[in-house]
UniProtKB/Swiss-Prot annotation:
This is Mitochondrial RNA-splicing protein MRS4. Its main location: mitochondrion. Belongs to the mitochondrial carrier (TC 2.A.29) family. The chain crosses the membrane at residues 23-41, 83-102, 120-139, 175-194, 209-228, 275-288. It is found in: Mitochondrion inner membrane. One of its GO terms (molecular function) is ferrous iron transmembrane transporter activity. It comes from Saccharomyces cerevisiae (strain ATCC 204508 / S288c). PROSITE patterns: SOLCAR (PS50920). It is a multi-pass membrane protein. It comes from the Eukaryota. Present with 1340 molecules/cell in log phase SD medium. The gene is MRS4.
Length: 304
């Protein structure tokens, strides 16, 4: 095998993380990416949750600057980190499943010879399957996280027990169908846009953290904007049982349809776009961090 053939083989091996790569490499890379993404961007995510949930109460402020100022003054600078334990506990395993499933499906759907060509539909399908598997694991942790983001006086175990005792086990999965409705297109577009941008900016498929970061940011901004209405519905379903929710129609919303009607009745069509700015602000670096961390871990693990 000559030098050029060897170089191409190495690029295919790196980019695809093929089936013969150790399973633990795929899982560790995914777990590392998930923990980095969710922990570093957690305060912005918490702000997004509060902006969306502000519509579940009477006379609540919804501006980003006013919310940050109010939270810092009344609750302290660490208030927006409340609940990070829950998301770290869930993000590691969930993202391990997410990226591991993605690589597995991608390796089965796309032959090694076709890895250098643009395969948006197969990439999107791989991301969709990965999302269904990962969200089944992550949804309970996400529900607990959002309750903690609204009520900073509680702890992870106390909230978990409170949800189970007062609302039953099903409460951890009320938002699962909506989460899938949001995350399936998010993941499909995420993988498709990221891979497409990578093919454009990095046609050699080489390890390049700056390019990975750029492509991840482009993907994150686009996907966040497209899925904000579904994220608003998901927030209603996940925090409806919280004591901080005061509007009765919001408290009774336990299905996708009821949550949608509640938002529409209380806020009109604009209600589906609450939290758009912090969601985009959060997802640009979050998705960039996730992809860069994943590619970094994948590169390191494949070389070692």
């Amino acid at each position: 095998m000559n030098t050029s053939e060897l170089s191409i083989a190495e690029e295919i091996d790196y980019e695809a993380l093929p089936s013969h790569a150790p399973l633990h490499s795929q899982l560790l890379a995914g777990a590392f990416a998930g923990i980095m993404e969710h922990s570093l961007m957690f305060p912005i995510d918490a702000l997004k949750t509060r902006v969306q949930a502000a519509g579940l109460n009477k006379a609540a402020s919804t501006g980003m600057i006013s919310q940050i100022s109010k939270i810092s003054t009344m609750e302290g600078s660490m208030a927006l980190w409340k609940g990070v334990q829950s998301v770290i506990l869930g993000a590691g395993p969930a993202h391990a499943v997410y990226f591991g499933t993605y690589e597995f499906c991608k390796a089965r759907l796309i032959s090694p010879e076709d890895m250098q060509t643009h395969q948006p539909m197969k990439t999107a399908l791989s991301g969709t399957i990965a999302t269904i598997a990962a969200d089944a694991l992550m949804n309970p942790f996400d529900t607990v996280k959002q309750r903690l983001q609204l009520d900073t006086n509680l702890r992870v175990w106390n909230v978990t027990k409170q949800i189970y005792q007062n609302e039953g086990f099903a409460a951890f999965y009320y938002s699962y169908p909506t989460t899938l409705a949001m995350n399936i297109p998010f993941a499909a577009f995420n993988f498709m846009i990221y891979e497409s941008a990578s093919k454009f900016f990095n046609p050699q498929n080489s390890y390049n953290p700056l390019i990975h970061c750029l492509c991840g940011g482009i993907s994150g901004a686009t996907c966040a904007a497209l899925t904000t209405p579904l994220d608003c519905i998901k927030t209603v379903l996940q925090v409806r049982g919280s004591e901080t929710v005061s509007i009765e129609i919001m408290k009774d919303a336990n299905t996708f349809g009821r949550a949608s009607r509640a938002i529409l009745e209380v806020h009109g069509w604009k209600g589906f776009w609450r939290g758009l700015k912090p969601r985009i602000v959060a997802n640009i670096p979050a998705t960039a961090i996730s992809w860069t961390a994943y590619e970094c871990a994948k590169h390191f693990l494949m070389k070692n």
